Design a protein with these regions (language model features):
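N-terminal ligand-binding/catalytic initiation module
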Residues: 1-107, 115, 125, 275, ...
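Adenosine-phosphate binding glycine-rich loop
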Residues: 6-8, 230-328
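Short helix-loop-beta connector
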Residues: 121-128, 150, 215-216
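Conserved beta-strand elements of the Class I
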Residues: 129-130, 295
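Glycine-rich Rossmann-fold phosphate-binding loop(s) that bind the pyrophosphate
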Residues: 134-135
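N-terminal Rossmann-fold NAD(P) dinucleotide-binding loop
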Residues: 138-139
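NAD(P)-binding Rossmann-fold cofactor-contacting core
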Residues: 148-174
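Rossmann-like adenosine-cofactor binding region
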Residues: 177-267
Length: 328
């Protein structure tokens, strides 16, 4: 079995690689080429939750299981908010062939989901980005946004002003190669003002921005909400949106309050949720048709992403001779 750390993975994969891997995963889901049961969630103490996400793809001769645990208060103790491990299994023998740092893989593939959405649904010419939230997923989300479009500026907002400022400074240095200014915003209104691309990545149970202030032509990726009673997306933006698209329509309509709450309140219907990003890739549904429409992308994550990401990373690591062999 090959053990792959965060540093091993960094050596063999780029964000653009991950965006393409996510596109492959989303296409496989809508093509029926991967078995991805809905995740199992066990709610624990301390506002924590344990998530189990299996997937199997005969075409890849591989299966995967990710265990990811969501503990939002970890950030107060300088701990990761979503520790995880990803297990890659040989589809021919059933042997576990790799164990990957699932926290980092999750950060990459979740960020890449927004990147794939922006690449497929965003305007071709975008100048400004906005991101609300600075937790464990935020850095990869920001990089994916920058990898998808050449931006001049990205504003960051978090309720913790000190953490927001420190994050912006760290990202300005760490993502300097993309050439964008990364600056802290005064508030959420300031953050999303004139933004072409918007990411929300928070554990909030209530909307984190004013949906009436989203500009025409914006693409919004909602990342943080995975429970029916939580909604970080302001429902006010939904009637203004020409399209609502998900990473998985089935999963999103089973899990996220961003959609379930406005559906229950009669603001939108299930039919307003057009489909999955894989349907856009396949041409089954249209993506962006003009530079004025607002498009909302809802991502809850599907196990196919973990499987494809783990397989791509594993193959590249074997080729590059990276990782630690264990039990052989």
């Amino acid at each position: 079995m090959l053990l792959l750390s965060k540093e091993d993975i960094k050596c063999v994969i780029t964000m653009k690689d991950m965006i393409e891997a996510d596109k492959q995963a989303f296409k496989m889901v809508v093509d029926g080429m991967v078995d991805t049961p809905l995740r199992t969630v066990i709610n624990g103490k301390y506002d924590g939750a344990f998530l189990f996400m299996p997937a199997y793809a005969p075409e890849l001769d591989a299966a995967a299981m990710k265990v990811i645990n969501i503990f939002p208060h970890n950030i107060d103790n300088n701990l990761m908010t979503s520790p995880a491990q990803t297990m890659l299994i040989d589809g021919k023998t059933g042997y576990v062939i790799a164990m990957l740092d699932g926290t980092y893989v999750t950060q990459l593939r979740t960020g890449a989901s927004s990147g794939a959405a922006f690449d497929l649904l965003g305007k071709k010419e975008c100048k400004k980005g906005a991101m609300i939230g600075t937790g464990g997923q935020a850095a990869a989300q920001l990089e994916a946004m920058l990898a998808a479009r050449k931006l001049e500026e990205v504003k960051i907002f978090d309720l913790n002003e000190e953490r927001c400022k420190a994050f912006a400074e760290e990202m300005q240095k760490g993502l300097a190669k993309y050439g964008a200014k990364i600056i802290p915003a005064k508030d959420s209104d300031d953050c999303i003002e004139d933004a072409d691309l918007i990411i929300t990545v928070t554990p909030s149970a209530k909307p984190v921005f004013d949906g009436t202030k989203v500009k025409a032509g914006a693409t919004i990726s909602c990342v943080g909400t995975y429970e029916p009673h939580k909604h970080e997306l302001d429902p006010a933006v939904l009637p203004r949106a020409s399209k609502i698209i998900c990473d998985s329509k089935e999963a999103a309509l089973s899990e996220t309050g961003d959609l379930l709450i406005p559906i229950a309140e009669g603001i939108i219907t299930e039919e307003d949720v057009l489909g999955s990003l894989g349907d856009v890739i396949n041409g089954k549904i249209k993506g962006r048709e003009n530079d004025e429409e607002i498009i909302v992308y809802e991502t809850v994550g599907v196990a196919a992403q973990d499987l494809v990401a783990a397989k791509v990373i594993y193959d590249k690591a074997v080729e590059a001779g990276k990782g630690l062999r264990w039990g052989e």
